[in-house]
C-alpha cells in the first residue's frame, strides 16, 4: 500500500513539475515580433506591378514610390510598337530648371522617375514615337521631422546636379537641388557615407544597426529604393567605403572579441560578399594600443602606387600602406604625438606644416596631392599636402579655415572644386570662392554632389543578400533557477526585441554603470551574450546589438541579466 501511495505521490509531483515546466516554457512565453524580409517584399511588389506592362504612352501605368521607401520617385510603364527611345521631363517648380532624361531604346518602357517635388502636383512630360504626353504625379508633403533648408545663399548658382546628404544621427538620407528643394529622400535609418558606384547605383550603410556606431553592412540600391545587393559584414561597417577598380568594396569595420575598436578595414568580394583581405592596423602599426586608439574615418586607394591611405582621428596621423603586402610606406604625423617606433616611417616636413590633428575625410586630388580636414587651435581647416616620394618629404600647399569647429567631411569634385559638410551646413567652393551655402535644421554627416540619373536601365532582377555576420561571441553562462518574473522590466529598461533575417536584435536603455547580458535558453543549450559592460561614469545610454543567425538554431527563451539579477522576459525567438 505504501508503495502505491508513493507512486501516486511521485506521479503527482512529476505532473505538477511538468505543469510548471509547460507553463513556464510554453504558456507564459510569447514569440517576439519578426520583421518582413525586405528582399522578399520587394520581389512581391515587382511581381504585382510588372505582371502587366500592356499600357500606352497615352495611358501609362504610373506607380509612385514603388518600393515604399523612396517617396519622391516613381515608375512609368508603357509599350510602343517599335523599338524607340523615350524622354521624360520633370517640369521645374516656380520657374526652376526642368529635369530631362532620355532612356535607351526599347519596346517595353519601364522608366524610373526621379526628382519629384514633395507635396506638389508634379508635371511630367513623356515623349516617345513622336507622341508627347503630359501627366501629373501628386506627392505627399515631407514628414514633419524632415531636415529642411533654413538658409540658402547660392549667388544665382545653377547646376543640374544635386547635393545628396546623410544624417549624423537622426534624419533622412536626401538630395537637395541648388534652390534648397528636396528632390529625393529615403525612409530608413541610413547613416555614414553615400556614394555612386560605377554601375550607377548608390551605396549606403545598411539601415540595420549592429551596435552603436556600426551598421550590419552595406546596401547597393537605385534611387527608386530597390535593393540589388545587401552585404553583411562580421565586424559591421562605419564611416567610409571605397569602390576598388576590380569592383570590390574596401570599408572601415571592426574586430569583435578584443578591447580595441575602429582599427580594422576589410575588402569584400562584390560577387560573393566574402572577406578577401583584412587590414588590421592593430597588428600592422607599432606602439601601444587600447580602446579607440586609431579611429579610422576615411580610406582611399591609389591605383598609381597600389596603396591605401587611411586617416586616424584619434591617432592624429595619416598612414599609407602598400596594398598587396600591407607594409607601411609612410606616415604623416607630429613626431611628438606618436611613439618612437614610428620614426622610420615619418615623412619629413618641407617647410612649415600643420600636422594632422583629429584628421578627417582624406581625398586624393591628383598624383601626389591630398586634401583633408584637420584641427588647428580649436578650428577646423582644410589642408592640402604634396608628397615627394623620392625624398620622403611632405609639403603643405594650402590652408583654408572653415567657419566652425564641427566635424568636417569633404568631397573633391575637381582640383579647384569641392563640397564641405560641417554640422548643419553644406558649402561648395570653386577656385577658393564660396558658390553655395545651405543650412538645414539637423546635423549632417556627409554630402556628395551627384546627378539623379546615371546609367539608369530598370531591371526586374531579384535582390541578393551576401556575406554573414559570423557567430556572435558568447560569455560565461549563469544558472537560471533564481530567475525572477517581473513584467515591468521591459518598460523600465525600454527593452526592444525583434527578429529579422540577420538574427535577434536587442536594444535597451541602461545606466552606464550597469552590467547587462542577454541569456538564451532552450533547456538543452544555453548561450549568454554581453549587451553592455559597466562603465565608470554616470548617466544613461541606449545600447543595441545583434545576436547572429550563424551558429544557433531552434527555439530559445529570452532572459535578461542586470547587475547579477536574472529576469524572465516571457519571450522566445526562433532561429
Model-predicted segments: where are they?
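Membrane-interface motif at the C-terminal end of an N-terminal transmembrane signal
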Residues: 18-36
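Sec-dependent signal peptide cleavage junction
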Residues: 48-52
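Extracellular low-complexity, O-glycosylation-prone stalks/linkers
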Residues: 89-97
Amino acid at each position: 500500500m505504501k508503495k502505491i501511495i508513493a507512486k501516486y505521490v511521485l506521479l503527482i509531483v512529476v505532473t505538477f513539475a511538468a505543469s510548471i515546466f509547460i507553463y513556464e516554457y510554453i504558456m507564459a512565453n510569447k514569440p517576439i515580433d519578426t520583421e518582413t524580409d525586405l528582399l522578399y517584399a520587394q520581389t512581391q511588389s515587382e511581381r504585382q506591378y510588372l505582371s502587366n506592362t500592356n499600357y500606352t504612352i497615352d495611358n501609362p501605368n504610373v506607380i509612385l514610390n514603388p518600393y515604399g521607401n523612396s517617396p519622391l520617385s516613381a515608375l512609368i510603364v508603357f509599350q510602343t510598337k517599335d523599338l524607340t527611345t523615350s524622354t521624360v521631363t520633370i517640369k521645374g517648380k516656380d520657374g526652376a530648371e526642368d529635369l530631362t532624361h532620355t532612356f535607351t531604346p526599347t519596346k517595353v518602357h519601364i522608366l524610373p522617375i526621379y526628382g519629384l517635388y514633395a507635396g506638389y502636383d508634379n508635371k511630367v512630360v513623356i515623349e516617345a514615337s513622336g507622341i508627347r504626353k503630359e501627366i501629373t504625379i501628386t506627392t505627399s508633403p515631407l514628414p514633419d521631422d524632415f531636415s529642411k533648408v533654413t538658409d540658402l545663399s547660392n549667388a544665382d548658382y545653377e547646376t543640374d546636379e544635386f547635393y545628396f546628404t546623410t544624417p549624423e544621427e537622426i534624419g533622412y538620407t536626401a538630395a537637395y537641388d541648388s534652390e534648397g528643394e528636396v528632390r529625393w529622400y529615403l525612409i530608413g535609418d541610413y547613416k555614414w557615407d553615400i556614394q555612386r558606384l560605377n554601375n550607377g547605383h548608390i551605396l549606403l550603410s545598411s539601415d540595420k544597426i549592429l551596435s552603436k556606431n556600426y551598421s550590419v553592412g552595406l546596401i547597393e540600391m537605385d534611387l527608386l529604393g530597390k535593393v540589388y545587393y545587401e552585404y553583411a559584414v562580421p565586424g559591421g561597417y562605419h564611416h567610409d567605403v571605397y569602390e576598388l577598380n576590380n569592383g570590390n568594396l574596401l570599408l572601415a569595420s571592426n574586430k569583435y572579441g578584443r578591447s580595441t575598436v575602429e582599427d580594422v578595414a576589410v575588402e569584400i568580394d562584390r560577387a560573393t560578399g566574402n572577406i578577401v583581405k583584412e587590414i588590421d592596423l592593430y597588428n600592422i602599426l607599432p606602439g601601444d594600443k587600447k580602446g579607440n586608439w586609431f579611429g579610422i574615418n576615411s580610406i582611399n586607394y591609389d591605383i598609381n602606387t597600389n596603396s591605401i591611405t587611411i586617416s586616424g582621428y584619434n591617432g592624429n596621423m595619416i598612414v599609407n600602406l602598400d596594398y598587396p603586402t600591407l607594409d607601411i610606406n609612410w606616415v604623416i604625423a607630429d613626431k611628438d604625438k606618436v611613439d618612437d617606433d614610428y620614426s622610420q616611417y615619418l615623412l619629413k616636413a618641407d617647410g612649415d606644416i600643420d600636422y594632422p590633428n583629429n584628421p578627417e575625410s582624406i581625398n586624393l586630388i591628383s598624383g601626389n596631392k591630398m586634401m583633408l580636414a584637420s584641427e588647428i587651435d580649436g578650428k577646423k581647416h582644410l589642408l592640402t599636402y604634396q608628397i615627394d616620394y623620392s625624398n620622403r618629404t611632405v609639403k603643405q600647399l594650402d590652408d583654408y579655415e572653415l567657419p566652425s569647429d564641427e566635424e568636417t567631411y569633404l568631397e573633391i569634385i575637381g582640383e579647384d572644386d569641392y563640397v564641405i559638410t560641417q554640422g548643419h551646413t553644406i558649402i561648395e567652393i570653386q577656385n577658393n570662392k564660396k558658390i553655395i551655402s545651405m543650412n538645414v535644421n539637423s546635423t549632417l554627416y556627409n554630402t556628395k554632389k551627384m546627378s539623379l540619373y546615371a546609367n539608369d536601365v530598370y531591371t526586374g532582377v531579384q535582390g541578393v543578400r551576401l556575406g554573414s555576420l559570423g557567430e556572435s561571441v558568447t560569455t560565461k553562462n549563469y544558472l537560471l533557477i533564481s530567475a525572477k518574473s517581473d513584467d515591468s522590466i521591459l518598460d523600465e529598461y525600454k527593452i526592444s526585441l525583434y527578429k529579422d533575417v540577420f538574427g535577434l536584435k536587442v536594444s535597451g536603455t541602461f545606466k552606464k554603470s550597469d552590467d547587462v547580458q542577454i541569456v538564451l535558453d532552450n533547456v538543452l543549450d544555453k548561450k549568454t551574450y554581453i549587451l553592455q559592460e559597466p562603465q565608470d561614469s554616470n548617466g544613461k545610454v541606449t545600447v543595441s546589438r545583434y545576436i547572429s543567425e550563424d551558429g544557433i538554431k531552434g527555439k530559445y527563451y529570452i532572459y535578461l541579466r542586470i547587475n547579477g539579477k536574472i529576469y524572465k522576459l516571457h519571450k522566445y525567438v526562433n532561429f
